[in-house]
Amino acid sequence: MFIDLTDGQAALRDELREYFGGLLTPQEREVLVTDRQGPVYREVVRRIGRAGWLGVGWPTEYGGRGLGQMEQQIFVNEAARADVPLPGVTLQTVGPALQAHGTSEQKDFFLPRILAGEVHFAIGYTEPEAGTDLASLRTRAVLAEGGGTYLVNGEKIFTTGAHAADYIWLACRTDPGAPKHKGISILIVDTSDPGFSWTPIITHDGAHHVNATYYTDVRVPVTMRVGPENAGWRLVTTQLNHERVMLGPAGRIAALYERVLGWAASQAGPGGRPLLAQPDVQRALGRACASLHVNELLNWQVAATDTVDVADASVTKVYSAEQTQHLGQLLEEVVARHGDPADEETGQLCRWLDIQAKRNTVLTFGGGVNEIQRELIATAGLGLPRVPR
């Protein structure tokens, strides 16, 4: 069996490839190498929104083009291939969750602004004492006198993009007496509230992506609760499944493969022979090409279904995260063996590969560490018994 895109999907891919290839100025691209949350990023997202691309797969009733999840995945892959950052959490996880569980007022307010690139969310889940065991979270939300507003107190950690977000999609405990999976609610927190604050966590790429966030009597209207009170765990798991798929676009591997392939094609190897004739270069690029196509199939498998399967989401995340890291190292070694860093083209490629390697470290634990993903694959996908705790 040969599986491929339809003619219409292939045409969309080619159109998006051309669009993303010409989207950024050289100055914008240089800024976005390290600053993927700031003003340049937000302007780029607004530009994509004005072009009508952000909602390519969203239903028309919510302002999208209505083409479907496969087309939305093509959009995400092509952005990753061109190394153009997207508001993945906002567009790929919060947006679909609001479509499924939001009130009419929430949909009317947030969804058009998301598609315009005007509103950005961060996810407030992990806490210092609740990482892998997320259901142990302690951040509290208590109804204030009168019952129309929650007062939120607590802290979160590793909140990516919180310093630049307009809202936090916050998991908090609204019933401390309930079993730990039962007393959780999802609130949308406005980051302009005076009780909200953050401190930066600088990651090893030297950039500021991640934060610790603090909530001190933060006021959240009850109208900003998503879904019923104490029924937030299902929203958490649904959002995480979407996030795991978001973390695994084949475009990341495509970017690594095509960039090094293009470099190798322009280089001479020993004795003046083409560098692409070297066996180690062929092996590395062949492996990258094969992994790229496997990743594409996993993306398409998830996109072809109406709902995101737990095991399929975890498989996609584990495979893509680990292959992206492994292939990044493999291709770096090829460039290190055969390239001259003093050469301008080679030096730029070395810098880009180093930044990718550091940036992609998060992939194996963002959205849930891969060790836990393997447990989910075993239990939800293969029907094996749960690991005793």
Predicted regions and their residues:
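A short core secondary-structure module
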Residues: 148-199
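Amphipathic, small/basic residue-rich leader segments at the start of a protein or domain
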Residues: 1-88, 109, 113, 261, ...
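C-terminal helix-coil-helix/basic helical segment that borders enzyme active sites and/or dimer interfaces
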Residues: 28-35, 269-276, 293-348
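Internal helix-loop-helix
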Residues: 49-108, 112-117, 161-167, 292, ...
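Glycine-rich beta->alpha junctions and the first turn(s) of the following alpha-helix
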Residues: 2-7, 196-295, 363
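A short, Trp-centered hydrophobic/proline-enriched beta-strand micro-motif
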Residues: 117-126
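Glycine-rich phosphate/cofactor-binding loops in nucleotide/flavin-utilizing enzymes
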Residues: 2, 74-75, 93, 233-242, ...
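A structural signal for short hydrophobic beta-strand segments in well-ordered beta-sheet cores
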Residues: 139-143
